């Protein structure tokens, strides 16, 4: 340890004869656990955690500690302003063919619950803040979900459309979305986006889940 070299030995709970080459069950478990950790460290190395937005409502758990991510996890934190989603929606920077497929799948399989505000006489400050027509909510959310995925992982389709930088992505391993309150006070929230990113399936079938934090909750 004086040379700062990590030594790691695996010992069984029971003493073995010196010529016994079998691997006890408890040692086998430790070896497999160590190997899984090694694979995880190698897989995460130099990937990124993408903060879409910043600290949510001053919540300490939503503060991305760059030193912890870089030094302990080997992940580089990156930040993307939430307005990037608005820019890509406005300019149509997403796969339009996949949008049609995703929207049709969502409308068929994702059933809405009841509207808790139905019939209420809401103040103008609230009704005025609803800038996306309720009938267009799912269109917006579908585009937002595709765009978030593209920000994290890139998309060759965008390169074909001429958006070369946007096509690259951030080589992400995980991400989070601020939302509250600068976004959700006037735009559809990211609940569906967060759920489908963390899901093991979407409109394309089975997929690997992506950890995606509500409120950019990196420290919890």
Predicted segments with their positions:
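An N-terminal assembly and electron-transfer interface module characteristic of large anaerobic redox
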Residues: 1-220
């Amino acid at each position: 340890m004086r040379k700062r070299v990590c030594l790691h030995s695996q010992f069984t709970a029971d003493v073995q004869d010196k010529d016994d080459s079998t691997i006890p069950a408890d040692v086998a478990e430790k070896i497999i656990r160590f190997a899984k950790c090694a694979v995880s460290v190698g897989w995460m190395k130099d990937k990124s955690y993408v903060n879409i937005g910043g600290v949510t409502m001053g919540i300490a758990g939503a503060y991305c500690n760059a030193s912890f991510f870089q030094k302990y996890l080997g992940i580089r934190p990156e930040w993307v302003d939430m307005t990037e989603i608005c820019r890509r929606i406005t300019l149509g920077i997403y796969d339009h063919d996949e949008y049609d497929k995703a929207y049709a799948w969502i409308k068929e399989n994702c059933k809405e619950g009841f509207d808790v505000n139905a019939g209420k006489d809401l103040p103008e400050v609230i009704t005025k803040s609803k800038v996306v027509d309720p009938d267009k909510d799912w269109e917006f959310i579908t585009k937002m979900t595709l765009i978030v995925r593209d920000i994290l992982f890139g998309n060759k389709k965008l390169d074909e459309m001429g958006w070369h930088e946007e096509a690259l992505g951030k080589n992400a391993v995980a991400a989070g979305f601020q939302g509250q309150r600068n976004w959700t006070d006037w735009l559809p929230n990211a609940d569906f986006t967060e759920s489908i990113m963390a899901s093991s399936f979407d409109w394309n079938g089975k997929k690997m889940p992506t950890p995606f934090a509500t409120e950019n909750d990196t420290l919890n």
